[in-house]
Every structure is written in C-alpha cells, then in structure tokens.
Amino acid sequence: MTTILKHLPVGQRIGIAFSGGLDTSAALLWMRQKGAVPYAYTANLGQPDEDDYDAIPRRAMEYGAENARLIDCRKQLVAEGIAAIQCGAFHNTTGGLTYFNTTPLGRAVTGTMLVAAMKEDGVNIWGDGSTYKGNDIERFYRYGLLTNAELQIYKPWLDTDFIDELGGRHEMSEFMIACGFDYKMSVEKAYSTDSNMLGATHEAKDLEFLNSSVKIVNPIMGVKFWDENVKIPAEEVTVRFEQGHPVALNGKTFSDDVELMLEANRIGGRHGLGMSDQIENRIIEAKSRGIYEAPGMALLHIAYERLLTGIHNEDTIEQYHAHGRQLGRLLYQGRWFDSQALMLRDGLQRWVASQITGEVTLELRRGNDYSILNTVSDNLTYKPERLTMEKGDSVFSPDDRIGQLTMRNLDITDTREKLFGYAQSGLLSASSATGLPQVENLENKGK
C-alpha cells in the first residue's frame, strides 16, 4: 500500500488537521470541490493566540467538511510538558538559555490524538499543513503511522495540482472570495508564529536573517522586556514540587495541571521569562533559526533543577543532563514514543524525578534575570554543617583529609609520568617556566 499519496484521492474520506487559517480553509474547500470527502479535526492545545475554539469547527462545516470535531488536547499536552521537565528533555541551548521543545511536544500530542479521532470515524487518510522543508512533516508522519498502521498521507502542499491552482496566499484568498466566502488575508507579519499552551515559536521571513533580532517580535505569552518603557516590577514566586510533579504556585494548589500551567505562564509571562533566540539543526541537518517563548515551562524548569542540584549526587546529575539532552533530541526528531525514548524517560522519572520534593522561592525581574531566594526540602543532601568554615564539630578531621590527599599521590605520580612520556614522543614540549611539559604554542607551529 502506498503510504504517501501525491494526488487527491477522489471519493474518499480525508482527515485534515484544520486550524481555521487561510491555508487549511482553502485546502478543505478545494478538496471538497474536487470530489474528496474532507473531515476536519482541530486540536485545542490552549493556543494563547486563539480566541474562540468552538468557531473553528463551524467554519470547517461552512467550507464543506463532512464532519468537524474539536479535540481537547490540553491535559495530555501539559502531562507531556511536565514529563519533559522531569527528564530535562531539552537539547538546544545558547548561552545558558534553553529551548523547551514546546513545538515538538505539541506535535507528539496532536499527531497521536487527531489520528486516533480520525480512526474512530473510519478516516484513514490524513493531511496537514506542514511543508517538505520542515520538521513537522516527519513528526506527523511518524506519530500518525504509530497510531494507525493503515494510515495514508495526503498533503495538498505536496500535490502539484493544488500548487498549480492555489500556490500562494494571494491565490488562496482570491479562491475563497470567488467561492462566496469573504475571507481576507490577515495582515502579513514580519515572521510566522506557531503556539500552544507550553510555548510559542516565531520564525521565518525576516527572522531568517540573523540581523533581525528578538526586538522585531511581539510576544504573545510575555512582554517586551528589552523595551525600557515597559515597566516590569520585581516579583517573588514560590514553586512547590512533590515527587517531581509541580503542585503549587505561591502556596496555591490547582484543580488540574492545565490550570497550574496557565498560572505559571501568567507569572513568568509578566517578566518575559523563558524567551530565547536559537540557531538549531533541523531533522534534515539544515540549520534554522527561531525565537521562542515558554514562560511557564521556564519557571518550573528553574525550580526543578534547583531542587535537583540540592538533592542528587554529582554522578546522578551528570546522567540527568546527558540523558536529558539525548532524550530532547529524540523528542525534537518526532521519536518521543520510540522505545529508546521510553527507556530514557523511565529511568529519569523513576530514579531522579521521584525524589524532587520541596519548595523554591525566586525573585523574577526582567526577561531571564532572576535570583533564587530560598530552597527548602526534606530530601536535601546539601548540609552546610558538613563544610562549615566555623569552628565546631565536623564529620571528618584534618587527619582524615591528610590521608585522603596522600592517596592522591598514586594518580598524581601516574599523571606526571605520562606527561614526560608525551614529551619524549614529541606530543608535548618542555617548559622552563613551569617545569612541566606543555602543549606547544600554536603560534610557533609551522615556523
């Protein structure tokens, strides 16, 4: 069976991931006119730039959908977001600022839940708006086929007939108007935005040029913290975790995790927390650039890692970071539910997150400027009395440290011998200044 269909399957049911925007509206109407039977599926991901979710399925029916459904994905999305925080599943960082993989998390949820809904309706052909140059076409492909082994893929944007007729936004707008729908193109922004409850992605157009900075972006989850005219008073916030799960903000508990994430977004968003500018490697290895918002994810991540460093030992923390980066890359590639990802997630959640219980108090200022004011946990292995510089009882004595240092003589002697061995083989050069062999000055190489 052909998995990817290059041309419209006339007379067959096609499920389309319907956003209500110009692209998917024109595609749905065009498919109906050409003889297909479109079914529209809209994911409610708590997008901060969407005002009326219920209106989207109604518009789909007006444009010719055989049926239109709104699928509430918010609970599952937040669950996956918290799992990513517990595992540190983030691999793109620049100068200490993190991209929280909010789009990959959204695709994992959308790609499975929408296809599951289609399967319930007997719809086994799926189309969406992802382009052939991006990451989403592969993410949706993987998640769709994982959910429904009989799934076939039809994308209007890969169909030459559709492209020839409606290849651009102007043509799509004219097509909608000609069909009796007063669909005017929205005002073109200098960049494209995609969002869900966990975060927003701004990319493309002017942002493809590296001399266009974050300053051209209008945040949809935060504030322009770089604008000195925007007043942002400092604010204290306390985050509480129990066994790796965020349970309270400023002492307030919530009826569900969706409400907690919304409040975390509001708190972090007031300061522009969690915005970052990243150059990243797409799945196809080409580099792209994005500016990201994730105020709630950032707030929870900061508090979680503060507790992590106070509770776990150095080797565990090292494995958390190494495995988290590996897991973050798998998530980015659309492999969040693959066996290698599940293996990493299980270990990180079982042995790391389960011990993260306590409270962290932060002072948030502008952007990613914050201070940690207090850290409280019954599980802390940080115990200041062990290393206090004040006179008093200690868990070890000066004689104990002398013995420990004496044992170091073994590897110090071995290292010294290796250094002189490297010098004899020409890998290092002698140094009169230190008495130890040195790496040769690069300026002198080749002279």
Curated annotation (Swiss-Prot):
Keywords associated with the record: Amino-acid biosynthesis, Arginine biosynthesis, ATP-binding, Cytoplasm, Ligase, Nucleotide-binding
Gene Ontology CC: one annotated term: cytoplasm
Binding-site list for L-citrulline: Y99, N135, R139, S192, T201, E203, E280
Residues the record lists as binding L-aspartate: T131, N135, D136
CDD domains reported in the protein's UniProt record: ASS (cd01999)
Subcellular location(s) per record: Cytoplasm
GO BP terms, alphabetized: argininosuccinate metabolic process; L-arginine biosynthetic process; urea cycle
Gene3D superfamilies the record matches: 1.10.287.400, Argininosuccinate synthetase, chain A, domain 2, HUPs
Catalytic activity entry: L-citrulline + L-aspartate + ATP = 2-(N(omega)-L-arginino)succinate + AMP + diphosphate + H(+)
Pfam name, any one: Arginosuc_synth
Family: Belongs to the argininosuccinate synthase family. Type 2 subfamily.
Designated name of the protein: Argininosuccinate synthase
